[in-house]
Structures are given as C-alpha cells and as structure tokens.
Amino acid sequence: MLVIGVTGQTGAGKGTVCKMLEKYGLYHIDADKVAHSVYKKGSDVLSALSEAFGEDILNTDGTANRAKIAEKASAENTEKLNSIVHPAVTQKIKAIIKEQSSLGTKGVLLDAIALFESGENRFCDFTFAVIAPEEMRLERIMVRDGIKKEAALRRIRAQKDESFYKNHADIIIKNYPPYNLDDEVKKVLLWAKL
C-alpha cells in the first residue's frame, strides 16, 4: 500500500489538497485529529502536558484546553510539546496504516504538520509539502480558527520556514496565484501513478 506524506505550514492548504486526493481512493490520516485523540481526559499525554506546561492547560472538567495548549506551544516550547505528544500520535498512526493496509486501501495520505520533525516521514513512500505566502496563510488561519492576528502569527512563527519544506519534501505544491491548484496536485498523482 502506498503511503504519501503531506506537510507544510499552517494555513497553506494541506487539508484542501488532501480532499482533492481522496477522490482517487486515498485514505486521509489527519495527524492533528489523531493528536487530539491522545489528549483524552486522564490520559498519560494530558498528564505529562499538564506537568510540563502547567495546570491551566486543563479546563475545569479536566479536559484539554486546546487553545491554551496552542498558546503555550510558542517557538521555544514546541520541542517540549512535540516530545510528549509525538510518540503517542506515531503509535496511533502506525495502527491506522496497518488497518488500512489490511482493508486493501489503495493508499493513505499521512497529513502531518511535523512530518519530518516527528520522524513519521519514514513510513512514507514519498512526501509533498504545500506552501503559500505568509500573508495568505495568516488570513486563512484567522478566518478558519476565528483567532486574532497576534495568535495566528504566534502559530506561524512556531513552525519551520518555507525553506525547510523545500529542502525536505520530494514535491512542493504551490497553493497561491498564479499557480493552479489542480495542476499542482497532478504532480502528486504522477508520483503516485494514480
């Protein structure tokens, strides 16, 4: 079974590209959603995060306050957050890939913002990164997540810059004018032989 790694900065359009590729029989694994599943109340991950970042990352009912966790995951704390969350996420992703393979799925899209940093790229046959200018990503994040400019900028600054993705990914998908996203996605289809 084909495993395609998908990465890029927040707001670049990874989800949009994955939706386009799902039409070709690929199963989409969203690492963010998998990560949210490891934040369950009472989980080892949530306990470790609370210890590392403080009790205020918990809501009064003991569930994860994702907005507070995102706020604490500034550039200097991203490594600490990732060292706690990534091992649990990787374990779940491996299980999903195994399950999809046993079901005879044509391939999976492993959509992970930290694909290379987490080492999850080692499960992939090839990788691609979606990129877009910071101004476009900033607008998209503010609209998508309903947050203010400062919060969106903190998220952007906590991530790798565009050159990181250009140096690590096999394919670069440009999700901004004058590039046509359908044409850009065809690059992935050619690599995948779909």
What residue spans do the PLM features occupy?
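Hydrophobic anchor at the beta1->P-loop junction of P-loop NTPases
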Residues: 6
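P-loop (Walker A) phosphate-binding loop of NTP-binding proteins
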Residues: 9
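ATP-binding Walker
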Residues: 12
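Walker A/P-loop
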Residues: 15
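Post-Walker A helix-loop "phosphate-sensing" segment adjacent to the P-loop in P-loop NTPases
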Residues: 23-31, 43-44
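ATP-dependent small-molecule kinase phosphotransfer cores
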Residues: 36-105
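NTP-dependent small-molecule kinase module
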Residues: 95-107, 121-130, 134-147, 161-194
